[in-house]
Protein backbone atom coordinates (compact mmCIF):
# COMPACT_ATOMS: atom_id res chain seq x y z
CA UNK A 1 0.00 0.00 0.00
CA UNK A 2 1.11 3.59 -0.42
CA UNK A 3 2.84 5.58 2.27
CA UNK A 4 0.91 8.29 4.02
CA UNK A 5 0.86 11.35 1.83
CA UNK A 6 2.34 9.63 -1.22
CA UNK A 7 0.92 9.94 -4.68
CA UNK A 8 1.94 8.09 -7.79
CA UNK A 9 1.80 9.52 -11.27
CA UNK A 10 -0.60 8.40 -13.93
CA UNK A 11 -4.36 8.27 -14.22
CA UNK A 12 -6.12 6.50 -11.41
CA UNK A 13 -2.99 6.24 -9.28
CA UNK A 14 -3.51 9.24 -7.10
CA UNK A 15 -2.80 8.51 -3.44
CA UNK A 16 -4.48 9.96 -0.42
CA UNK A 17 -3.23 12.56 1.99
CA UNK A 18 -1.41 15.87 1.75
CA UNK A 19 2.27 16.59 1.26
CA UNK A 20 2.85 14.89 -2.07
CA UNK A 21 2.45 15.57 -5.77
CA UNK A 22 1.99 13.41 -8.83
CA UNK A 23 3.57 13.86 -12.22
CA UNK A 24 2.09 16.61 -14.32
CA UNK A 25 1.17 16.72 -18.00
CA UNK A 26 3.91 15.79 -20.39
CA UNK A 27 5.39 13.01 -18.28
CA UNK A 28 4.03 10.35 -20.61
CA UNK A 29 5.55 9.45 -23.95
CA UNK A 30 5.28 6.63 -26.46
CA UNK A 31 8.34 4.53 -25.75
CA UNK A 32 10.10 2.56 -23.02
CA UNK A 33 9.08 2.79 -19.43
CA UNK A 34 7.49 3.72 -17.28
CA UNK A 35 10.39 4.76 -15.07
CA UNK A 36 9.14 6.04 -11.72
CA UNK A 37 11.16 8.75 -10.00
CA UNK A 38 10.93 9.18 -6.24
CA UNK A 39 11.58 12.82 -5.32
CA UNK A 40 11.54 14.69 -2.03
CA UNK A 41 11.08 18.07 -3.72
CA UNK A 42 8.76 19.10 -6.56
CA UNK A 43 11.58 21.22 -7.97
CA UNK A 44 13.22 18.05 -9.27
CA UNK A 45 10.35 17.24 -11.61
CA UNK A 46 11.10 19.81 -14.36
CA UNK A 47 14.83 19.04 -14.12
CA UNK A 48 14.33 15.39 -15.00
CA UNK A 49 11.63 16.15 -17.54
CA UNK A 50 14.09 18.43 -19.37
CA UNK A 51 16.83 15.80 -19.26
CA UNK A 52 14.41 13.21 -20.61
CA UNK A 53 13.37 15.50 -23.46
CA UNK A 54 17.00 16.24 -24.26
CA UNK A 55 18.55 12.79 -24.16
CA UNK A 56 15.86 10.11 -23.71
CA UNK A 57 12.94 11.09 -25.90
CA UNK A 58 10.17 8.54 -25.72
CA UNK A 59 10.99 7.46 -22.17
CA UNK A 60 7.89 7.59 -19.97
CA UNK A 61 8.50 9.12 -16.55
CA UNK A 62 6.19 8.98 -13.55
CA UNK A 63 7.08 11.34 -10.72
CA UNK A 64 6.33 10.59 -7.09
CA UNK A 65 6.98 13.57 -4.82
CA UNK A 66 6.91 12.86 -1.08
CA UNK A 67 8.48 15.83 0.66
CA UNK A 68 8.00 14.55 4.20
CA UNK A 69 10.46 11.70 3.62
CA UNK A 70 13.43 14.08 3.59
CA UNK A 71 12.13 16.11 6.51
CA UNK A 72 11.80 13.00 8.66
CA UNK A 73 15.06 11.49 7.47
CA UNK A 74 16.87 14.69 8.42
CA UNK A 75 15.42 14.74 11.92
CA UNK A 76 15.23 11.01 12.70
CA UNK A 77 17.69 9.38 10.30
CA UNK A 78 17.11 7.62 6.96
CA UNK A 79 16.16 4.30 8.56
CA UNK A 80 13.17 5.99 10.19
CA UNK A 81 11.48 6.31 6.79
CA UNK A 82 12.37 2.85 5.46
CA UNK A 83 8.82 1.50 5.75
CA UNK A 84 7.30 4.55 4.08
CA UNK A 85 9.85 4.43 1.27
CA UNK A 86 9.04 0.77 0.69
CA UNK A 87 5.32 1.60 0.61
CA UNK A 88 5.88 4.27 -2.05
CA UNK A 89 7.95 1.84 -4.11
CA UNK A 90 5.29 -0.85 -3.81
CA UNK A 91 2.68 1.60 -5.08
CA UNK A 92 4.89 2.58 -8.02
CA UNK A 93 5.33 -1.07 -8.98
CA UNK A 94 1.60 -1.73 -8.62
CA UNK A 95 1.00 1.18 -10.99
CA UNK A 96 3.24 -0.41 -13.62
CA UNK A 97 6.73 1.02 -13.07
CA UNK A 98 9.44 -1.14 -14.60
CA UNK A 99 12.12 0.52 -12.48
CA UNK A 100 12.36 3.27 -9.86
CA UNK A 101 15.00 5.99 -9.63
CA UNK A 102 15.39 7.60 -6.20
CA UNK A 103 16.60 11.17 -6.67
CA UNK A 104 17.15 11.91 -2.96
CA UNK A 105 20.65 11.02 -1.77
CA UNK A 106 19.65 11.04 1.89
CA UNK A 107 17.22 8.15 1.44
CA UNK A 108 18.90 6.56 -1.58
CA UNK A 109 20.42 3.64 0.31
CA UNK A 110 17.11 2.87 2.00
CA UNK A 111 15.32 2.86 -1.35
CA UNK A 112 17.98 0.77 -3.05
CA UNK A 113 17.80 -1.93 -0.37
CA UNK A 114 14.04 -2.34 -0.64
CA UNK A 115 12.94 -5.56 -2.31
CA UNK A 116 10.44 -3.89 -4.59
CA UNK A 117 10.25 -6.51 -7.32
CA UNK A 118 11.76 -4.17 -9.93
CA UNK A 119 15.18 -2.49 -10.08
CA UNK A 120 15.49 0.45 -7.68
CA UNK A 121 18.39 2.76 -8.50
CA UNK A 122 20.10 5.58 -6.66
CA UNK A 123 20.48 8.66 -8.81
CA UNK A 124 23.92 9.31 -7.32
CA UNK A 125 25.55 5.91 -7.90
CA UNK A 126 26.88 6.65 -11.43
CA UNK A 127 28.24 9.97 -10.14
CA UNK A 128 30.03 8.20 -7.29
CA UNK A 129 31.58 5.73 -9.72
CA UNK A 130 32.81 8.61 -11.88
CA UNK A 131 34.34 10.30 -8.85
CA UNK A 132 36.26 7.16 -7.93
CA UNK A 133 37.51 6.85 -11.51
CA UNK A 134 38.76 10.46 -11.42
CA UNK A 135 41.22 9.82 -8.61
CA UNK A 136 41.62 9.00 -4.93
CA UNK A 137 40.93 12.47 -3.51
CA UNK A 138 37.18 13.00 -3.50
CA UNK A 139 35.41 15.92 -1.84
CA UNK A 140 31.68 15.60 -1.17
CA UNK A 141 29.64 18.82 -0.97
CA UNK A 142 26.18 18.82 0.58
CA UNK A 143 23.72 21.46 1.70
CA UNK A 144 22.06 19.25 4.32
CA UNK A 145 24.04 17.28 6.87
CA UNK A 146 21.94 14.13 6.49
CA UNK A 147 23.25 13.65 2.95
CA UNK A 148 26.94 13.55 3.84
CA UNK A 149 27.17 10.13 5.48
CA UNK A 150 25.15 8.24 2.83
CA UNK A 151 27.15 9.84 0.02
CA UNK A 152 30.51 9.11 1.62
CA UNK A 153 29.44 5.50 2.14
CA UNK A 154 28.39 5.28 -1.51
CA UNK A 155 31.71 6.63 -2.79
CA UNK A 156 33.60 4.19 -0.57
CA UNK A 157 31.40 1.35 -1.81
CA UNK A 158 32.13 2.24 -5.43
CA UNK A 159 35.85 2.44 -4.63
CA UNK A 160 35.73 -1.05 -3.14
CA UNK A 161 33.85 -2.29 -6.19
CA UNK A 162 36.50 -0.81 -8.47
CA UNK A 163 39.42 -1.99 -6.34
CA UNK A 164 40.65 1.56 -5.85
CA UNK A 165 41.83 3.50 -2.83
CA UNK A 166 39.85 6.61 -2.00
CA UNK A 167 40.15 9.42 0.53
CA UNK A 168 36.80 11.18 0.97
CA UNK A 169 36.45 14.59 2.59
CA UNK A 170 33.19 16.40 3.21
CA UNK A 171 32.06 20.01 3.05
CA UNK A 172 28.72 21.18 4.41
CA UNK A 173 27.72 24.33 2.53
CA UNK A 174 26.46 26.39 5.44
CA UNK A 175 23.40 28.50 4.69
CA UNK A 176 22.84 27.16 1.19
CA UNK A 177 19.79 25.09 2.05
CA UNK A 178 17.91 28.13 3.31
CA UNK A 179 18.06 29.54 -0.24
CA UNK A 180 16.58 26.32 -1.62
CA UNK A 181 13.81 26.19 0.97
CA UNK A 182 12.93 29.80 0.13
CA UNK A 183 12.67 28.97 -3.56
CA UNK A 184 15.80 30.97 -4.45
CA UNK A 185 17.38 28.34 -6.65
CA UNK A 186 19.78 30.83 -8.22
CA UNK A 187 21.10 31.89 -4.82
CA UNK A 188 21.35 28.25 -3.84
CA UNK A 189 23.38 27.38 -6.94
CA UNK A 190 25.70 30.35 -6.41
CA UNK A 191 26.37 29.37 -2.80
CA UNK A 192 27.20 25.82 -3.83
CA UNK A 193 29.44 27.01 -6.67
CA UNK A 194 31.39 29.28 -4.32
CA UNK A 195 31.95 26.35 -1.98
CA UNK A 196 33.08 24.13 -4.84
CA UNK A 197 35.53 26.73 -6.09
CA UNK A 198 37.05 26.92 -2.60
CA UNK A 199 37.95 23.21 -2.59
CA UNK A 200 41.64 22.40 -2.97
CA UNK A 201 43.65 19.19 -3.30
CA UNK A 202 40.88 17.15 -4.88
CA UNK A 203 40.62 14.92 -7.93
CA UNK A 204 36.83 15.22 -8.05
CA UNK A 205 34.15 17.29 -6.36
CA UNK A 206 30.83 15.54 -5.81
CA UNK A 207 27.64 17.58 -5.57
CA UNK A 208 25.84 15.19 -3.27
CA UNK A 209 22.27 16.38 -3.86
CA UNK A 210 20.47 16.39 -7.18
CA UNK A 211 19.27 19.91 -6.40
CA UNK A 212 22.87 21.13 -6.54
CA UNK A 213 23.31 20.29 -10.23
CA UNK A 214 22.88 23.86 -11.58
CA UNK A 215 25.98 24.90 -9.60
CA UNK A 216 28.05 22.63 -11.81
CA UNK A 217 27.87 25.20 -14.61
CA UNK A 218 28.78 28.15 -12.37
CA UNK A 219 32.06 26.84 -11.02
CA UNK A 220 35.47 28.00 -12.22
CA UNK A 221 37.62 25.37 -10.54
CA UNK A 222 39.73 23.15 -12.83
CA UNK A 223 38.77 20.16 -10.68
CA UNK A 224 35.96 18.06 -12.20
CA UNK A 225 32.63 18.91 -10.54
CA UNK A 226 30.16 16.03 -10.76
CA UNK A 227 26.38 16.08 -10.37
CA UNK A 228 23.89 13.24 -10.38
CA UNK A 229 20.74 13.96 -12.45
CA UNK A 230 22.08 13.37 -15.97
CA UNK A 231 24.04 10.12 -15.38
CA UNK A 232 21.41 8.90 -12.93
CA UNK A 233 18.58 9.28 -15.43
CA UNK A 234 20.72 7.63 -18.10
CA UNK A 235 21.18 4.62 -15.83
CA UNK A 236 17.45 4.44 -15.23
CA UNK A 237 16.73 4.69 -18.94
CA UNK A 238 19.16 1.87 -19.66
CA UNK A 239 17.42 -0.38 -17.16
CA UNK A 240 13.89 0.14 -18.49
CA UNK A 241 15.05 -0.16 -22.10
CA UNK A 242 16.70 -3.49 -21.29
CA UNK A 243 13.73 -4.87 -19.36
Language-model regions, residue ranges each:
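Non-catalytic structural scaffold of enzyme domains
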Residues: 1-10, 14-243
